[in-house]
């Protein structure tokens, strides 16, 4: 008898099961109601959609393109505004994010330009000496 009594659920478990059962039944009912409404809506609206599709499809296409255009124009405007703000802060010396990378790249480009200039000066002198060797009177 004690084993049977140990396996019986307590009132909290019973209340939890009843709550689970009731909420599951309500959700199942709402799912069926939604499915029924969807089917009835499709049955009623399909002939209307087919009849007006020569008007609705181009209209939907135009609306989609217009909305996409406005959203992308706004996004590009926001990107340009943030780039101008960053550039303003950089010029004013306020050190915006990424300024270190820009300074490093500028130094690398300047160093490379200096090396190219020095190499061109050396190579130009080398060519000048070769020309004088080839044509001593020139």
Curated annotation (Swiss-Prot):
Keyword Metal-binding found: no
Protein name as it appears in the record: Oleosin G
Family: Belongs to the oleosin family.
Primary location recorded for the protein, binned into one broad class: other
Alphabetized Pfam families for the sequence: Oleosin
Keywords: Lipid droplet, Membrane, Transmembrane, Transmembrane helix
Compartments where found: Lipid droplet; Membrane
InterPro entries tied to this protein: Oleosin (IPR000136)
Domain comment, as recorded: The proline-knot motif may be involved in targeting to lipid bodies.
Transmembrane stretches, start-end: 14-34, 48-68, 69-89
One GO CC term, this protein: membrane
GO biological process, one term: lipid storage
Membrane topology: Multi-pass membrane protein
Extent of motif Proline-knot: 47-58
Tissue: Expressed in megagametophytes (at protein level).
């Amino acid at each position: 008898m004690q084993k049977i009594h140990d396996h019986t659920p307590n009132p909290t478990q019973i209340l939890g099961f009843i709550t689970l059962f009731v909420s599951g039944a309500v959700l199942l009912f709402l799912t069926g109601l939604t499915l029924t409404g969807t089917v009835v809506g499709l049955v009623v609206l399909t002939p209307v959609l087919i009849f007006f599709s020569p008007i609705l499809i181009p209209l939907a296409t135009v609306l989609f393109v217009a909305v996409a255009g406005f959203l992308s124009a706004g996004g590009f405007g926001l990107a340009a505004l943030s780039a101008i703000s960053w550039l303003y802060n950089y010029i004013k010396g306020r050190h915006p994010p990424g300024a270190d990378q820009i300074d490093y790249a500028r130094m690398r480009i300047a160093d490379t330009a200096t090396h190219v200039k020095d190499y061109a000066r050396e190579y130009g002198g080398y060519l000048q000496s070769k020309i004088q060797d080839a044509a001593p009177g020139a």
